[in-house]
């Protein structure tokens, strides 16, 4: 199955660690990162899409992406 996630977080080290952890679990970056200002919290937010192929599994809507 092919999986897709969109990782988001504040523009700080925690977001970088989230992306790094995903890369180390076999996820691959997909497309360009995003960067925007959250007017409610008044902080910059980052986003990055990631994809992963998992052999021998079928996708179901109940699939928990963080398990992969």
Model-based region annotation:
Residues 1-68:
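Terminus-proximal functional modules
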